[in-house]
Amino acid sequence: MTKHIIVIGGGLGGISAAIRMAQSGYSVSLYEQNTHIGGKVNRHESDGFGFDLGPSILTMPYIFEKLFEYSKKQMSDYVTIKRLPHQWRSFFPDGTTIDLYEGIKETGQHNAILSKQDIEELQNYLNYTRRIDRITEKGYFNYGLDTLSQIIKFHGPLNALINYDYVHTMQQAIDKRISNPYLRQMLGYFIKYVGSSSYDAPAVLSMLFHMQQEQGLWYVEGGIHHLANALEKLAREEGVTIHTGARVDNIKTYQRRVTGVRLDTGEFVKADYIISNMEVIPTYKYLIHLDTQRLNKLEREFEPASSGYVMHLGVACQYPQLAHHNFFFTENAYLNYQQVFHEKVLPDDPTIYLVNTNKTDHTQAPVGYENIKVLPHIPYIQDQPFTTEDYAKFRDKILDKLEKMGLTDLRKHIIYEDVWTPEDIEKNYRSNRGAIYGVVADKKKNKGFKFPKESQYFENLYFVGGSVNPGGGMPMVTLSGQQVADKINAREAKNRK
């Protein structure tokens, strides 16, 4: 008899797992509480402006392409992606700007401010991150390794210690090789992909720089939601039964097994395996009602990553100095990280990520206007949450900073505004305390590891998404779905022997 897989949540991890399980011959049912597939890969359109509500950067497209190739299909027949050789522009408080290009040579050619020594150091750092990326790919990505002990067993103790560089934090690894203060801050903020602090995260995450340099930075034409739509279409073609507007209220358990799910309609659906794309702690807390002692232990080790204050602005003017992707950096990177990740307060001078897709795709705003998405990282929801007044003051702080750093009269030109707070993120995606990136990467707390993909409490329960390895970001959560499918396939093959 064909075994039945239930997938809870249609984010990229969930839809990826569903596709691979269906491709492997299982009966698959996916339940998504929202009316769209893609999770945080969401879309907002109003007054002629289009915004990607969630991720705005596509990297490592080969991970997505593999899903189509398993079905002997081409992703290019489903969605169009465009490479962006000019990856982003960095603005600094003293007026300095640095343009990051795909390729160290190209970055040097486009930035007269960078010296020969700067470029040599940048190349040296890229070589260092390449070594980490290569060894990470062998075990962490290709075999879905989940713990430090698995890493050590796979690679050997000395090889793992040296090549994963578990001695240093990410920022220490950067500062050891880079002397230019602007480059130090820019490279440190690659940690944005996982919503953590470069001063706390292990140096292994330096590989994020090499990933982007080698694999490129891409734009999904028409908006990144088209990628989720493509995956949904592939899933349906492979026979996945997708239920949207369907909320799972409870996971039924018996001893050390999960037996099925109870929907908000009261219907019970049996399962041989359950794959949860809901974050690990909310799954245990709200769907399984795990005891407080075990929950508290998990919460101490796997703290949420950062959230964000997300502004979607329709602007009745154009700012020619903006690139597609932009970063407006803080005066004091260390203080910014401290306030967000340790003091848990709204930062005084946040680093701001600003996306202006209209620079590449003119269909995203009316002629002569621009669509601007603004995202500074802020703490996840605290026991005493920030108030409406707190957020209003923070909004003013953001706009003050952007105007001061060159976006003249931005306030006057805003004709449309939509804002998402951590509370909105938690409500819409059931994320843990409104975190955007799952679990924080912290060298001391968890060695940079997220939750394992296999439940430690229930033998046929698996997890995908940003709260499990290999981590947050679109390619990683998509890869987690493929890795879980591989684990279930391997287990079933072993059972048949």
UniProtKB/Swiss-Prot annotation:
Assigned EC number: 1.14.99.-
Keywords linked to the UniProt accession: Carotenoid biosynthesis, FAD, Flavoprotein, Oxidoreductase, Virulence
Gene designation: crtP
Gene3D superfamilies: FAD/NAD(P)-binding domain
Source taxonomy: Bacteria, Bacillati, Bacillota, Bacilli, Bacillales
Pathway(s) where this gene product acts: Carotenoid biosynthesis; staphyloxanthin biosynthesis; staphyloxanthin from farnesyl diphosphate: step 3/5
Descriptive protein name: 4,4'-diaponeurosporene oxygenase
Pfam family, one: Amino_oxidase
Substrates-to-products reaction catalysed: all-trans-4,4'-diaponeurosporene + 2 AH2 + 2 O2 = 4,4'-diaponeurosporenal + 2 A + 3 H2O
Enzyme class: oxidoreductase
Organism for this UniProt entry: Staphylococcus aureus (strain N315)
InterPro entries: Amino_oxidase (IPR002937), Carotenoid/retinoid_OxRdtase (IPR014105), FAD/NAD-bd_sf (IPR036188)
